[in-house]
């Protein structure tokens, strides 16, 4: 399967089911009471991290995801069924961004972790809810709300315990193959590895017997000078380094390893300065190609850079057991690492817009008389409430008027200068303003 670590998708949660406007019907009962049931909740879109998946490629053929609508309520107080949620299974290490706002809406760093990225609509209430001492037979019900829709950008930052970083042809793939069960492409030319490759490294005792301890190791494609600016494979794979718990700088002893280490650290610093805070060591590779005295001299020079240095030969197997055991000892505790490296997910709150009241004068219908005084109401959540009763506005007018009064709309209109008999307009709903305090 091809490797893909960025994907744009569209998600649409299910709409809430409408409440029912119904009255009890039975033999010998001419006027039964209201018995409309509530609508069901719309299904949500849920992102879920699963193991065994290391790419977003499996989602390419399906870019749009829709959850099930809630079912409408029915008579006899029967509530509509909730819509079924839709799960999108992604690799551990997937971050979801809202494309329009750029906000982080999910960051999944553990197997089984879930996050709702599009919330299902609310079910509407049936007419049985709206009875009162003065309203014993309400002929209206509440409609369900639309499900949330959004465009989402998925970015995968592979969560590997150890990340191998180095220049092309430094021997990272050979080292990964020698330490783990991975089978990367290996050749004597740069950029053999064109996507991150994961392998599992097993701990062994002194006799070479496998123990019940392991970690994952990632071969990050070769970095070149200017990678942080997009050169070579550039930014395409630098993001994966940010998810590793420990970095191993793989350096070729036959080149200029001190200079290459400094250049690698400069590229990481330019991309994300916090990467240099990771636990790290140097694997000085291909020592079989030089005299031991020269290899030791290079090791001493590298040690002056402040990192532990181990001489290894991926080809001959020299130093691999020491490197493996050192990595097990250096790896920080996973739970502490996960807590400190997860991105902060911004709360997905819905905030009503501030109330705005705008006055206008409309010409009289027949061109005679005084202009009609109209007060437009925007925000404050009032328009959304109108939409929920749009099918029953005439019958729900009294209920809505009392609701708006309790919520302070009449006081706001009075302060704005509304007079008795003026028209109030909220979306498509129009009613006459009545000031009962005059």
Swiss-Prot record:
Entry annotated with the keyword Isomerase: no
InterPro entries: G_OBG, GTP-bd, GTP-bd_Obg/CgtA, GTP-bd_prot_GTP1/OBG_C_sf, GTP1-OBG_CS, GTP1_OBG_dom, GTP1_OBG_dom_sf, OBG_GTPase
Known cofactor(s): Mg(2+)
Keywords: ATP-binding, Cytoplasm, GTP-binding, Hydrolase, Magnesium, Metal-binding, Nucleotide-binding
Entry keyword Glycoprotein: no
Positions that bind Mg(2+): 173, 193
Stretch forming the signal peptide: none
Subcellular location per the Swiss-Prot or TrEMBL entry: Cytoplasm
Predominant place of localization: cytoplasm
OBG-type G domain sequence ranges: 160-332
GO molecular function term, any single one: ATP binding
Binding site residues for ATP: 166-173, 191-195, 219-222, 285-288, 313-315
Positions of the Obg domain: 1-159
Gene3D superfamilies, A to Z: GTP-binding protein OBG, C-terminal domain (3.30.300.350), GTP1/OBG domain (2.70.210.12), P-loop containing nucleotide triphosphate hydrolases (3.40.50.300)
GO cellular component: cytoplasm
EC number(s) recorded for this UniProt protein: 3.6.5.-
Family indicated by similarity: Belongs to the TRAFAC class OBG-HflX-like GTPase superfamily. OBG GTPase family.
Oligomer and partners: Monomer.
NCBIfam families the record matches: Obg_CgtA, Obg_CgtA_exten, PRK12296.1, PRK12297.1, PRK12299.1, small_GTP
General function of this protein: An essential GTPase which binds GTP, GDP and possibly (p)ppGpp with moderate affinity, with high nucleotide exchange rates and a fairly low GTP hydrolysis rate. Plays a role in control of the cell cycle, stress response, ribosome biogenesis and in those bacteria that undergo differentiation, in morphogenesis control.
Identification of the protein by name: GTPase Obg
Species in which this protein is naturally found: Deinococcus radiodurans (strain ATCC 13939 / DSM 20539 / JCM 16871 / CCUG 27074 / LMG 4051 / NBRC 15346 / NCIMB 9279 / VKM B-1422 / R1)
């Amino acid at each position: 399967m091809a490797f893909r670590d960025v994907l744009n998708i569209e998600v649409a949660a299910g709409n809430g089911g409408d409440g029912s406007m119904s009255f009890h019907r039975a033999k010998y009962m001419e006027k039964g009471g209201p018995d409309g049931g509530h609508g069901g909740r719309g299904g949500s879109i849920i992102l879920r991290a699963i193991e065994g998946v290391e790419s977003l490629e499996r989602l390419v053929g399906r870019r749009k995801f829709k959850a099930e609508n809630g079912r409408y309520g029915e008579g006899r107080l029967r509530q509509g069924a909730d819509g079924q949620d839709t799960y999108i299974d992604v690799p551990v290490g997937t971050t979801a961004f809202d494309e329009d706002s750029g906000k982080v809406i999910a960051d999944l760093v553990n197997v089984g972790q879930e996050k709702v990225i599009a919330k299902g609509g609310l079910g509407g209430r049936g007419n049985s809810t709206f009875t009162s001492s003065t309203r014993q037979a309400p002929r209206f019900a509440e409609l369900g709300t639309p499900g949330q829709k959004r465009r989402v950008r998925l970015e995968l930052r592979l969560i590997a315990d150890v990340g191998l970083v180095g220049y092309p042809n430094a021997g990272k793939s050979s080292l990964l193959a020698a330490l783990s069960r991975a089978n990367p492409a290996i050749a004597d030319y740069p950029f053999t590895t064109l996507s991150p490759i994961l392998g599992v490294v097993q701990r062994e005792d002194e006799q070479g017997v496998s123990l019940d301890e392991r970690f994952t190791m990632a071969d990050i494609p070769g970095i070149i000078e200017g990678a942080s600016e997009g050169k070579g494979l550039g930014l395409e794979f630098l993001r994966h380094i940010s998810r590793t718990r420990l970095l191993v700088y793989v350096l070729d002893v036959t080149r200029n390893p001190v200079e290459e280490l400094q250049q690698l650290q400069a590229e990481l610093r330019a991309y994300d300065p916090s990467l240099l805070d990771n636990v790290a060591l140097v694997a000085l590779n291909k020592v079989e190609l030089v005299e031991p005295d020269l290899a030791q001299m290079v090791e001493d020079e590298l040690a002056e850079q402040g990192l532990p240095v181990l001489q290894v030969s991926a080809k001959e197997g020299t130093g691999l057991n020491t490197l493996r055991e050192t990595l097990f000892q250096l790896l920080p505790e996973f739970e502490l690492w996960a807590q400190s490296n997860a991105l902060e997910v911004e709360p997905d709150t819905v905030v009503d817009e501030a109330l705005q009241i705008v006055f206008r004068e409309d010409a009289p219908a027949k061109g005679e008389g005084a202009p009609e005084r109209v007060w437009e109401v925007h925000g404050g959540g009032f328009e959304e409430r109108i939409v929920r009763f749009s099918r029953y506005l005439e019958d729900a007018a009294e209920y809505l008027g009392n609701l708006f009064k309790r919520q302070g709309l009449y006081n706001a209109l009075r302060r704005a200068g509304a007079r008795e008999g003026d028209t109030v307009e909220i979306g498509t709903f129009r009613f006459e303003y009545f000031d009962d305090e005059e």
